[in-house]
Amino acid sequence: MAKDDKKKALDIALKKIEKDFGKGAVMRMGEKVDTQISTIPSGSLALDAALGVGGYPRGRIIEVYGPESSGKTTVALHAVAEVQKRGGTAAYIDAENAMDPAYAEALGVDIDSLILSQPNTGEEGLQIADTLIASGAIDILVVDSVAALVPRAEIDGDMGDSHVGLQARLMSQALRKLSGNISKTKTIAVFINQIREKVGVMFGNPETTPGGRALKFYSTIRLEVRRAEQIKQGSDVIGNRVKLKVVKNKVAPPFKVAEVDIMYGKGISQTGELIDMAADKDIIKKAGSWYSYGDDRIGQGRENAKQYLEEHPDVYEEVKEKVREAYGIDAKAIEERENPEKVKQDKEVPVNKDASDEKK
């Protein structure tokens, strides 16, 4: 077949595919408009830096897993709050029936506009998730948690009945269906998962996550959340130091670690992580126990430095901008990814001819 005939045959095939399956079903990579990864901030500056792209990528699956009470739900709720701040719509599939509206509100979540579902079975929860995602109206959907998505057969059966691999099959089937809609609608799907231990493992890591291997494969990002140490005020425990490890990342280099303070009743301490990140880049100087910014001493000890930044929002914003720049979490770069057309229009604003003539 001649080269021109091949080109014509390919064009006919492409047109037929578009007619049968809709525009965008197939395209040349050079024609694809959305070559940049569009993201939404995670609610933690340290985590945004660790993720490598400034936040959670749109149209992708994120798995957040870890031991009990490590801060998994807190991490997910911060992402929900960030989406809502930007005018987006969030949905929450509460399979554990453990949603605390007061705590979510303290983290900045708009409870009134949050779409909440508490399904009775795993099939029901995943069907609701698929319907919401397919609508194209949801920006972020959280499933809390995969371990609580119990198959109907297990709920209807008797205690002690064996249902080997039932939940894994359910997740595998659901993710095959969900992944396409998630990508098309640019929805961020966050699956919270628990940790289990394999019986009889002598060597290697005995820990695993429920729901089979499908979620591991389909996830663009896998976040491991673990408590590092307690945060105390005198003898009272007021929070936990938490490590967020990016175990898998398809959009940037993996294995980066972010450390954050999760305070009881308040969530991630954004001021605390800002001080740590600024100190690492010498934006805030640390000499002994004293913290200094510019020529000013801002506090003796980390807690006093945090208090200073909380009381001086102008200094806080100034330090934040410098930290974003130092770590490559540039707000302008994110805007270019989010609104490339708007940025292009701003760049193409015509110069006032009279003003330019006067300069000459």
From Swiss-Prot:
UniProt main location, coarse: cytoplasm
SMART domains (alphabetical): AAA (SM00382)
Molecular-function GO term, any one: ATP binding
Organism domain of life: Bacteria
Positions bound to ATP: G66, P67, E68, S69, S70, G71, K72, T73
One GO-annotated biological process of the protein: DNA recombination
Region annotated Disordered, chain positions: 330-360
Record InterPro entries: AAA+_ATPase (IPR003593), DNA_recomb/repair_RecA (IPR013765), DNA_recomb/repair_RecA_CS (IPR020584), P-loop_NTPase (IPR027417), RecA-like_C (IPR049261), RecA-like_N (IPR049428), RecA_ATP-bd (IPR020588), RecA_C_sf (IPR023400)
Gene3D superfamilies from the UniProt entry: P-loop containing nucleotide triphosphate hydrolases
Any Gene Ontology CC annotation: cytosol
Subcellular location(s) of the protein: Cytoplasm
A Pfam family hit: RecA
Keywords assigned by UniProt, alphabetized: ATP-binding, Cytoplasm, DNA damage, DNA recombination, DNA repair, DNA-binding, Nucleotide-binding, SOS response
Function: Can catalyze the hydrolysis of ATP in the presence of single-stranded DNA, the ATP-dependent uptake of single-stranded DNA by duplex DNA, and the ATP-dependent hybridization of homologous single-stranded DNAs. It interacts with LexA causing its activation and leading to its autocatalytic cleavage.
Stated family: Belongs to the RecA family.
NCBIfam families, per the entry: tigrfam_recA (TIGR02012)
Protein name (database record): Protein RecA
Organism: Lactobacillus johnsonii (strain CNCM I-12250 / La1 / NCC 533)
